[in-house]
Amino acid sequence: MGQKIHPTGFRLAVSRNWASRWYASNTQFAGMLKEDIEVREFLKKKLKNASVGRVVIERPAKNARITIYSSRPGVVIGKKGEDIELLKAELQRRMGVPVHVNIEEIRKPEVDAQLIADSITQQLERRIMFRRAMKRAMQNAMRLGAQGIKIMSSGRLNGIEIARTEWYREGRVPLHTLRADIDYGFSEAETTYGIIGVKVWVYKGDHLGRNDAPVVEEPQEERRKRPGRPEGRRREGEGRPAGQRRGAGAGARRGTDAKTGE
């Protein structure tokens, strides 16, 4: 199941959170969900060159708070904040409520799965060999601290007539382990031969759950004593000089007594 299911949806209740965080009645839910999808598509087209990893939408009390995670926040903000003000006005017009826009910087874009997928698709659209693009992305991710990465490309690779799928993996990517921090990204390249889909899984380590706290080892002197062995007493034979057999001292004394007759 872990190989097929969406890694983020699989871990939502364990180590991941929703990208849309709000509550709505049954009559309003579908409309608000459609609005979120349209806002994300608009931001994806508008900020195509800003390296946007993900967009989080919150709706507190007739307002909207949109957090944009980008590796190039200067492109989103623009000169003296002009671009972000225009973006905020357009979002308010689309959503019909006051909108607050926050920009969060992605410190390591080389290990962000969505940014890796977008980078590979941009290279494919520029006619770069897909194997070279995939292997270069894997090397950069492993160099910057990823514990494992898997990249899959599907479609008419290199313009061949029959579509196929190729994937490469480096390190370990435990998709069945719920506590594993798996970042997932998907992107599509629109080439002259058709669409090529790129999927990326990045393994960044394990999340510690409530019962998985690290165990501190007890000092040697405070360890519990073995059962049936009182403190301060040693077994017979412990502490003898090396090479001396058990009972050798008593036998030697008896032999001396027999010779002297004492």
From Swiss-Prot:
Part of the 30S ribosomal subunit. Forms a tight complex with proteins S10 and S14. One of its GO terms (cellular component) is cytosolic small ribosomal subunit. Binds the lower part of the 30S subunit head. Binds mRNA in the 70S ribosome, positioning it for translation. Keywords: Ribonucleoprotein, Ribosomal protein, RNA-binding, rRNA-binding. Transmembrane segments: none annotated. This is Small ribosomal subunit protein uS3. Belongs to the universal ribosomal protein uS3 family. Disulfide bonds: none annotated. Gene3D superfamilies: 3.30.300.20, Ribosomal protein S3, C-terminal domain. Pfam families: KH_2, Ribosomal_S3_C. GO terms for molecular function: mRNA binding; rRNA binding; structural constituent of ribosome. It comes from Ralstonia pickettii (strain 12J). One of its GO terms (biological process) is translation. Residues 211-262 are annotated as: Disordered. The gene is rpsC. Residues 39-107 form the KH type-2 domain. Residues 221-239 have a biased composition (Basic and acidic residues).
